[in-house]
Amino acid sequence: MARYIFITGGVVSSLGKGLASAALGALLQARGYKVRLRKLDPYLNLDPGTMSPYQHGEVFVTDDGAETDLDLGHYERFTGRPATKQDNITTGRIYQDILTKERRGDYLGATIQVVPHVTNAIKEFIVSDNDGYDFVLVEIGGTVGDIEGLPFFEAIRQIKNDLPRGDVIYIHLTLLPYIPSAGELKTKPTQHSVKELRSIGIQPDILLCRTDRPIPKEERRKLGLFCNVRESAVIEARDADSIYAVPEAYHAAGLDDEVLAAFAIAAKEPPQLGRWHEINERIRNPEGAVTIAIVGKYTGMKDAYKSLIEALSHGGIANKVQVKLDWIESEVFENEDPAPFLEHVNGILVPGGFGQRGAEGKIEAARFARERNVPYFGICFGMQMAVIEAARNLAGIEQANSTEFGPTPEPLVGLMTEWVRGNELEKRSQAGDLGGTMRLGAYPATLKRGSRVSQVYGGVTEISERHRHRYEVNTAYKDRLEQHGLKFSGMSPDGVLPEIVEYEDHPWFIGVQFHPELKSRPFDPHPLFASFVQAALVQSRLV
């Protein structure tokens, strides 16, 4: 039977509960345990699919097509276990399910209340389908005291009494701020946070304390005394230069030992952390550096590109180089020459996005990369803009555009109205809802034998990648574009949907309709990112 670890947060948001959960999951895995990680999000949206990138950050897409919180990306990257739609739930989804049952009459006329109906639904989600796992780590979004989070805290309070004694522990992630004028770390915010947590019936077993400096013994003693935890359970979570240094740091601080002790499990062998040590050595001691320009639409919110940033770092690990990122808002290129911004970079990456704002700037970035022989990686929207650039400037289709931006006489990119998923035909229309209606999740693609992209993937001709898009390149223009050098080297198995384009006579120019960054891991870098960084490294030696 699985044991449950609940990770809560206090004092301030954005302390890194998702990263802490992922790091602890990796440590337990390294001890030979099988782990599952889940995220509870208290917001009323059904999922983050229609939320602004500036408010939510990245939407992480799973193989089975769920649009989820970006923390699930941390879970996958640290443990290697693919997340599913059953690993993330929101208040909105819970309420939708409850109200559907109420309309159906499932509650037999009962008054529907937060307790017990909402809390029971949360508990059912937490404990469902956990057979075969040793530990289930559950992160509760937000901070203790948030009104919207109260049903979740009540549910995890109840669940300790529902399960056998000793099967549940609580870890509270908090902040110890340093006050320069006083010259000391302050424990009072943490004491108040734990007091709030205890007032709703939850006594934390472990305090994970974010800090930028060592915690003095006296402060540990004080936290243990006033928060009612053992002094050994006050774990120092020091700021790290790399997120991949966190598992080793947490182990050195005793987190995994304390977790096992809280469950009364005798630690037999130390965790096998050799692979973590190896990648951290590569990160700390690179043999070179490359600069990649990310020409995006949401560069003011780096979390909107979280998996992309990590995938590029994985490409750097694979090539033993540091990847430096130069963030450029694509709208800049609509009024200014891109050359001064891009002449010094070793590669250009144009990521996904939605809407007309900044689209022309992305087209200019693709043109610069093509004409100057700079490695170019276009992802989703970035591929579509590269195709429009080729149509306008190589094939002479001056009015080439996307119907996403409005009516156009030359629809190089258009709305997908139907596609095949498994054995079923999916259909969409312009009048449909926005939420949950895109082409989402893992789909197969067939690669052209002998193409550059096939070589990047190791010579295979069949791949599976995750998608999140509503628009697709129009195959009616395929022959004209190929006559001018832009090759369609990857297609859906039925030959209907273009998946990959490339230039054969360019050092490295690849556009993909899918999101390869979602499947990259520090120990298994995605081949496209490893190859792109390698091409950037070659380019860096030419200038």
Curated annotation (Swiss-Prot):
Leader sequence residues: none
Binding-site positions, L-glutamine: Y54, G353, F381, G382, M383, Q384, E404, R470
EC nos: 6.3.4.2
SUPFAM superfamilies to which the protein is assigned, alphabetical: Class I glutamine amidotransferase-like, P-loop containing nucleoside triphosphate hydrolases
GO biological process: 'de novo' CTP biosynthetic process; pyrimidine nucleobase biosynthetic process
Residue ranges of domain Glutamine amidotransferase type-1 in the record: 291-542
Similarity comment: Belongs to the CTP synthase family.
Listed name of the protein: CTP synthase
Lineage: Bacteria, Pseudomonadati, Pseudomonadota, Alphaproteobacteria, Hyphomicrobiales
